[in-house]
Amino acid sequence: MNATRFESIVETLLPSLLAGDRSAVRTLVSRALGSGISAEDFTEQVAWPIHEALHKLHRHDQIERISFNYATRLLRQVVDQMQLAYSRAERNGKCVTLFCGSGENEDLGGQMAADLLEAAGFAVQFAGGGVASDEILEETSRRRPDFLVLFASSASDAPGIRSVIDRVREVGATPDMEIAVGGGVFNRADGLAEAVGATRNARTPLDLVRTLQAPSATARQTPPKARPARLRAVA
């Protein structure tokens, strides 16, 4: 299905989400799936762009808080519905521990990534946002995942992410663990992934799946050593 078709679905669905029209949303989603769109494509090409649009509209005060809440909660229901229909791959032996920004919109973005990673065969622990850096460090030291993923983070999370990555490098308890970032502020600030020291970067949930599936030599960036450089502010 071409991009124009997905854009049309987004443009039709978004007003119903903002209005909190649950019946209309169910009808539109069912119609889209009935036209042959896979659940994975719906999440990547419809739910994710709407998620990003909601963040932008809310950040620039172009929608009221009540509309943002309506849309975010209804979109989560849609995402929950989609993940039940994902094709499931066999386990690939790789573990992911995933965190995201603390807002509900960021949490929804993290959920999309977690759901698609799990469907692709990764073992996923998704803790959401608001977790202290000490707890993240302890959890990764205990679980020793193949990947620590910090996805769909807000601008205010960037210094904390840098701190977490620097501490992981300094402690050295998980030398083989790669750190991936993406979505959220990392889509709005060129070079931020490199600045915080991430080894992999992805723009969307499905892009994250492909990035983590790629061989290390293909996807890895050279992680910089801990340094006091200041991160520029990002909206």
Show the residue positions of the predicted features.
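Long amphipathic alpha-helical segments
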Residues: 1-90
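Residue-level detector of anion-binding/catalytic polar loops
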Residues: 38, 123, 146, 199
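Conserved hydrophobic helix-helix packing surfaces used for dimerization/oligomerization
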Residues: 96-97
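Active-site-adjacent loop and "lid" segments of alpha/beta metabolic enzymes
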Residues: 100-108
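Short helix-loop-beta junction
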Residues: 111-125
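Cofactor-cradling patches in redox/metallo enzymes
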Residues: 118, 131-190
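A short glycine-rich beta-strand->turn/loop micro-motif centered on a GG-aromatic cluster
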Residues: 123-133
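Peripheral docking tails and interdomain loops at the edges
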Residues: 184-235
